[in-house]
Each structure stands twice: as C-alpha cells, then as structure tokens.
Amino acid sequence: MIQFRALGLGVVVSTFFAAGAVNAATEADAAKLGKELTPVGAEKAGNKDGSIPEWKGGLPKGQRKLGDARVDPFAADKPLFSIDASNVEKYKDKLSAGQIELIKTRKGYRMDVYPTQRSCGYPDSVYGQTKINATLAKLSNDGKDNLAQAVGGGFPFAIPGNGAEAVWNHRLRWQGEGRVEFYQTNFINPDGSFYGLAQDQWIMTPFASPKAKSPEDVADVQMKLLNVATAPASRTGEIILAHYFLKKSNDAWMYFPGQRRVRRLPAFEYDNPIPGYENLETADQYPMFAGSLDRYDWKLVGKQEMYVPYNSFKFVAKRPVKEVYEGMYPKRDLMRYELHRVWKVEATVKQGMRHMFTKRTFYIDEDTWMILNADQYDAQGKLWRVMEASLYPAVELGACVSQEFQSWDLTVNRYMAENSTQEAKPTDWLAGAEGRIDPKRFESDELRRVGDR
C-alpha cells in the first residue's frame, strides 16, 4: 500500500496494489475525473496558500498559422523571487537533487520563479479516451511492464497505481498525431564553446489517434521517428529511423551516407548511446525517458510541490542559438520556473538486470504527465546526469507540448541542449493529423532513397 497526502485537498489518498498487479482503477476512482480531479487526473483545486491556483481548463485552442510568432499570454508576469546559491537551502524542499547541484556548482546559475499559471488543457477527445482508459488500461503481468490493454488518443493511467503506470503516461503524453520539426542539438564544452548538429525530424504517433481501440489496431506501434542530419557537413545525410512499440523492444536503422549503406542498429534502447551524440545521451534518455521499462522496479513515491520549467515562451522564441546557451547552462533571463505539483517516481535497477544508471528519479507534471526533471545516478549512488525539460501551450493543437531539454553530465562537466528550435523553421504540430507526412518515410527500405535525395 502507498499512502500520500493529496496536496491541496487535505485528505489522504490510499492506492492499493500487489506486486505485479495490473488492475485498472475502480469505477469510483474513475468517477472523480472531471470533478475533484481534472479530466487527466490532476488535482483540480489549488493549494492551501493559493500559490498553486485552481485548474480552470487551461488556455483555449486557437488559430495560428504556421510560422506566426507565438504570443506569450503571460509576458507581463514578473518574477516573484529568484533561487540561487545564496538562498537555495531555504527552498530545497521544493527542488530536486539535480537542481540543487546545478545551483551550488554552476556559478551564476539561478531560477527565476514566476506566478503559477495552469495553462495546460487538452481536446475533449483526449478527455474522453482518458476516461475510458481509467477502468480499461492495464500493464502486462510478466514483469516487463508493457502496455497490455488501452485505447489510443488519451492517457492510459490518469489515476496511477504504481510508478510504471505514471511513466507510461509520459510515454503516451498527447502532443498530436504527428509532427515535422527542425532543430539543433548543441554539445557544450566547459568553456562554453559548442557545436550544433542540425536535424530535420518526422514523427508519427499512431496510438495518439482516438481511432485506435487497442494496441493491435496500430500494429503495436507507439511512435515512428525519422531523423535526418543537415549540418555540419561532416554529418550531413546521416539518418536514424526508429520504431517504438507498446509491447516489445524498439527497432532502429541508420543510414551512412559515405557508404550509402543502411545498417540495422542492434540495440537502440536502454543505456546504449545514441550514435553521434558523444556519449552524452543514452537511447532511453530521449526525450527524458523512452522505451522499455523492464530493467527497473518503479516506485510511485507520491506528489510534491516543486519549482519546474513552465510556460517557456521566452525560452523557445526565435533568436540565434548563441544567445540562448551561455557557458554551462541556458541564459537565465530566458528561463521561467513556476510552482506546480508533480508526481515523484523512483526507478531502481532490478536484481539481475544491468543499466549504467542504477537509480533514476523522475518528476512528472500533474497537468500534462510530462517528465520535467530527471536525476540519474551511477553504481556508487552518485548523481551523474541531470535533466530538465520545458513546456508551453501550442494553441493550434489545444495542448501543451515539450521539445527542448537539457542534460548535464557531471562527470565530464559538459552538457547538451536537445531539440533547440530557436533558430530553426517552425514545428508543424498538425502535420500528422492533417496528412502532411508520408507514411512511407518510416519504412527501412526507404532509407537509402531518402538519403540519396
């Protein structure tokens, strides 16, 4: 049994489950969705002192032409206070170990805390599918924590009974049915110098469609991803194709332009390094966590209030990348932190399994189920890699989205900034739903043709 205090409600919530249990939520629990809980399972009420407000539906869906600058509805907000090395101890109960480490060890690192704006909502179709899943969705009982049963187009476990279910909500976070994005991955050195790997990426998420009545309806596919490097010249034409599944391990292929050869990647998951990423990111770190859950025991610790990146309009606004990343962290004036409730999940490597990160801690936003912070530890229990993601509402989608994230490797004193879109063409978040992505792109036989264009 897990017991934790439901913050803001003033009542104790108990979740009962046995080891390996796969049961969905009860009808009584599911009935809370849309009432005291939001339609995706967050606490609707604010907290006791009002620093976290009541959820009122998030920003409404709106019209936006591709290429139009995003309008920041909270641009007039001013920081309430800042957290830095001089006062970090005062706020440590609302910070992760990784955040505290960055504040204490990176000179000038600070977190500007703004008023909390619960801006994230979803289309009605997502709410409806989430409600169905509340009493339907189940994980496998074979110890692998695969998704055994659910409908698509919604969150599977709005009322999670264990840590694995909470992480599956992150894996299936709703960001539309497919997108085309252009970005740069920046590899940053201790002296602040960096080089960028420019990439074009096509993503389809078949299980994000409300038409998917089961994993079998989409041939077990969660996501298909095609990534093409476009700069620097030494990397141009490299292609990675990956298929992420709901019930089995990932498949991946890579095209090498110099050899005009397609090679199947034997292991594109777990702690295997992403090719060309200078050993700074593992396959299951992208984005924040992805892939199979079977090497860890997952503990749902409970909820806590935490300062996390939120409503990151200023950070993702168009500007030269060199103006965003200064020294060993993104420019502080561009970052916005807010107080939100997060689910804390601890992952510990199972006995008999191996992974370079023997322990991981994830902090999952209650309103979006997105992992916003993650700490990774080595075999000696020492903090190794610290990760942070940002999010903002995409009004054309009617949902919050997350692209940019950073990962600091504390052992080599470097960090990487993933999915930096500030200097790139705009992301087409509606490309999948509106038919602007050719499904043939995601076939391994097409890789050489795409690379030879």
Where are these predicted regions, by residue range?
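Solvent-exposed N-terminal domain segments of exported/luminal and surface proteins
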Residues: 30, 34-250, 256
